[in-house]
Amino acid sequence: MSPQTHTLSVLVEAKPGVLARVAALFSRRGFNIESLAVGATEQKDMSRMTIVVSAEETPLEQITKQLNKLINVIKIVELEDGNSVSRELALIKVRADAGTRSQVIEAVNLFRAKVIDVSPEALTIEATGDRGKIEALLRVLEPSVSVRSSNREWCRCPGPRGIGTAK
């Protein structure tokens, strides 16, 4: 069975060294963390780590059990479609001269994206949505303009059924 991408939401105590201990656990087990975001929660003394890792089910289960043994870990939830919300943010820089600029702006408006920077020969676009929406925007833009660069970041967070504080 090939590894699949898994997203873990890990509620931890907001204390120095917790991130290092969690990252070391993944490293010792030979897992590469593909994406990591850490931020404060609504509870002042807690932080939430969102960790994306590729793994098969059995090793992921083992690492989850090991995470639960860490003293500063409060709760771990694997985020899936049913218990989370996901979005992708794309920053796309396109070559757009006076002749193609109106076409680009039309496409941007159609996808409810925003032009966030303008220069004489290029536009920078900010788009958010699911992966399909971002891919569709890129397909619409590519025939008429040259995409100079793009940076895409995907994130997932607990939805209403994925939030709680019990271990």
UniProtKB/Swiss-Prot annotation:
It catalyses: 2 pyruvate + H(+) = (2S)-2-acetolactate + CO2. Residues 7-81 form the ACT domain. GO terms for cellular component: cytosol. Its EC number is 2.2.1.6. SUPFAM superfamilies: ACT-like (SSF55021). One of its GO terms (molecular function) is acetolactate synthase activity. Keywords: Amino-acid biosynthesis, Branched-chain amino acid biosynthesis, Transferase. It comes from the Bacteria. GO terms for biological process: isoleucine biosynthetic process; L-valine biosynthetic process. It is an enzyme of class 2 (transferase). InterPro entries: Acetalactate_synth_ssu, Acetolactate_synth/TF_NikR_C, Acetolactate_synth_ssu_C, ACT-like_dom_sf, ACT_dom, AHAS_ACT, AHAS_small-like_ACT. Pathway: Amino-acid biosynthesis; L-isoleucine biosynthesis; L-isoleucine from 2-oxobutanoate: step 1/4; Amino-acid biosynthesis; L-valine biosynthesis; L-valine from pyruvate: step 1/4. Belongs to the acetolactate synthase small subunit family. This is Acetolactate synthase small subunit.
